[in-house]
Amino acid sequence: MEITASLVKELRERTGVGMMECKKALSENAGNIDAAVEWLRKSGLVKADKKAGRIAAEGRIVVVHDGGKAVLVEINSETDFVAKDSHFLAFAEAVAQAALVAGAVDVEALKSVKLPSGETVEEARAAVIAKIGENVRVRRLARIDSANNVAAYVHGGRIGVLVEVKGGDVELARGIAMHVAAMNPPYNKVADVSAEFLEKEKEIELSKMSEKDKSKPADILEKIISGKINKIVKEVTLYGQPYVLNADQSVEQVVKAAGADVIGFQRMEVGEGIEKIVEDYASEVMKQVGLS
């Protein structure tokens, strides 16, 4: 497969590695981007694939919370310009409120829910599109209904979190929600980390070791690898991370000191996993006034 400049550019954006190293990684892996990322990780040139954290689409995250009930909704627009439009914002808030009241559990069920205007969510979406001249999509919905402490947190309309905590108090739950928003842990506790993830990380750590280290006795080698994996597990679990409101303690220590337990959490960030053609602000304005 031909290694094109666009492939090299994409790999560089995902990893932050130099162009020559990216070209070599692609050549070694027949132009396969994902395989090239892993090859670079095994070579010790990059710690992680940055693509997963790149936000591509626009829109808004809306959170609505009432006691033990809370919903988290992502509404997408094509541009940031429209994401700040009053019609778009009113629609997003109305959809989230309706989702909470109706008990909707997914986007498909939400489409037929009626808003205070008498329109269904889908009908209102079509009306908003007609007003603003841009596609609008209700992309994701998450909810919690529980007798436990439930907290909701939204940051700048772009990141939203729901957290369920058994025991403790609402303030603890809110602090945990803020932590999840800031640190984005993939897993809750050690028990939640997948065997596939652990095996892959073990393979990567082994690949990065020197031949001298690899030649050590099996029990010593296992201790070295286990130490590295344990460190990684702390980084990717909520319980293992230093608490953002008190970095001297881990989240697990803070939660246990309160006699509590984090049952689970939901986190959304605008545009996760969606690619977007980059346009400058002037282009967005021109598009809105019909001059492009």
Swiss-Prot record:
<dbReference type="InterPro" id="IPR018101">
    <property type="entry name" value="Transl_elong_Ts_CS"/>
</dbReference>
<dbReference type="InterPro" id="IPR014039">
    <property type="entry name" value="Transl_elong_EFTs/EF1B_dimer"/>
</dbReference>
<feature type="region of interest" description="Involved in Mg(2+) ion dislocation from EF-Tu">
    <location>
        <begin position="79"/>
        <end position="82"/>
    </location>
</feature>
<comment type="function">
    <text>Associates with the EF-Tu.GDP complex and induces the exchange of GDP to GTP. It remains bound to the aminoacyl-tRNA.EF-Tu.GTP complex up to the GTP hydrolysis stage on the ribosome.</text>
</comment>
<comment type="similarity">
    <text>Belongs to the EF-Ts family.</text>
</comment>
<dbReference type="Pfam" id="PF00889">
    <property type="entry name" value="EF_TS"/>
</dbReference>
<dbReference type="InterPro" id="IPR001816">
    <property type="entry name" value="Transl_elong_EFTs/EF1B"/>
</dbReference>
<dbReference type="InterPro" id="IPR009060">
    <property type="entry name" value="UBA-like_sf"/>
</dbReference>
<dbReference type="InterPro" id="IPR036402">
    <property type="entry name" value="EF-Ts_dimer_sf"/>
</dbReference>
<keyword id="KW-0648">Protein biosynthesis</keyword>
<keyword id="KW-0963">Cytoplasm</keyword>
<keyword id="KW-0251">Elongation factor</keyword>
<protein>
    <recommendedName>
        <fullName>Elongation factor Ts</fullName>
    </recommendedName>
</protein>
<dbReference type="GO" id="GO:0005737">
    <property type="term" value="C:cytoplasm"/>
</dbReference>
<dbReference type="GO" id="GO:0003746">
    <property type="term" value="F:translation elongation factor activity"/>
</dbReference>
